[in-house]
Amino acid sequence: MATLGPMNTKVTTTHLYNHRDLREQAMIMLKEVRAIDGVEALSEQFVRGLAEPGLGHTHYTVSVDGRIIGLGATDGETSELAVHPAHRRQGIGRELIDALPTDGVWAHGDLPPAQALASSLGLNKTRELLVMAVEGDALREAAVYDNPAGITNSSLKTAPGTRDEVEGKWLKANNEAFHWHPEQGGWDRNRLTRAQSATWFRETDVLFLWDGDELVGFHWVKKHSDELQEIYVVGLAEAYRGKGLGDPLVRLGLRHMVNGGARRVILYVEADNDSAVAAYEKLGFTVAERHVVYEK
């Protein structure tokens, strides 16, 4: 391990997936941050990176009395960090940002402490991701699904063709829909396989619309619990955009979630994706959280 920064707040560079005791400390701290802030400090991918060497993440820790009270993580392109609420306004966030190698740092929730730190460092907000949510009567109304004429639907488990063929069509539609997206675009078979290794993944929660044997689009659901579920990824193949099929594709997944017991559904969407935000607002979704990237 290498040590960076002044002696009063040492920032240690490490790989937590190689150190079980430190990883457990980090997870405890993240739970305490969640309890106080009301939002997760690290995204799902970065939490997985604490334990999975294959993701190739590097970690930066600050400890007091043998206990981690500050954590940074990077995948080489972007970074995330957390400071325990009891140790904020002590320069720890500044030290972590100085140690992180990327220009962009996520602030999940864009809470006042993060805004204050960004302002003090002269960081600029360059990206904003919205968490939108729907529940109650609005959710039940949004979950009304009418199958478009000439279109069929299936799950990944019941899709026509071999698994290899279906996943190839799924990847093609994904990369057409998200060619512009920094995390969701440019997927290959290995990336899809890693995504399916998540503990929450179920074949029955990946839904498809079909035009014969052509994939129209997909709706991937993430089940946090019976009551709380998520539109994880939804996308249309290029050939089927602009044909009014986006709305039924979203409703197909919402019906699936409501039938599975969902009482609240969330999704993540780029704040500057005006058409998508408007479509979700039309279905009854409202903004619940904001996540931003600040850049040096």
UniProtKB/Swiss-Prot annotation:
Coiled-coil regions listed in the entry: none
One GO term of the biological process aspect: mycothiol biosynthetic process
Main EC class the enzyme belongs to: transferase
Binding site for acetyl-CoA 1: L81, A82, V83
InterPro entries with a match to the protein in the record: Acyl_CoA_acyltransferase (IPR016181), GNAT_dom (IPR000182), MshD_Acetyltransferase (IPR050276), Mycothiol_AcTrfase (IPR017813)
Every N-acetyltransferase domain range: 17-146, 156-296
Signal peptide limits: none
Pfam families per UniProt: Acetyltransf_1, Acetyltransf_7
Binding site for 1D-myo-inositol 2-(L-cysteinylamino)-2-deoxy-alpha-D-glucopyranoside: E44, E183, K222, E230, Y268
Database matches in Gene3D superfamilies: 3.40.630.30
UniProt-annotated binding residues for acetyl-CoA 2: V234, G235, L236, R241, G242, K243, G244, L245, G246, D247
Catalytic activity as recorded in UniProt: 1D-myo-inositol 2-(L-cysteinylamino)-2-deoxy-alpha-D-glucopyranoside + acetyl-CoA = mycothiol + CoA + H(+)
One GO MF term: mycothiol synthase activity
The EC number(s) this enzyme carries: 2.3.1.189
Record keywords: Acyltransferase, Repeat, Transferase
PANTHER family the record matches: L-AMINO ACID N-ACETYLTRANSFERASE, MYCOTHIOL ACETYLTRANSFERASE
NCBIfam families documented for this protein: mycothiol_MshD
Subunit architecture: Monomer.
The protein's role, per its UniProt record: Catalyzes the transfer of acetyl from acetyl-CoA to desacetylmycothiol (Cys-GlcN-Ins) to form mycothiol.
UniProt-listed HAMAP family: MshD
Family: Belongs to the acetyltransferase family. MshD subfamily.
Protein name: Mycothiol acetyltransferase
Species of the source: Corynebacterium efficiens (strain DSM 44549 / YS-314 / AJ 12310 / JCM 11189 / NBRC 100395)
Chain's gene name: mshD
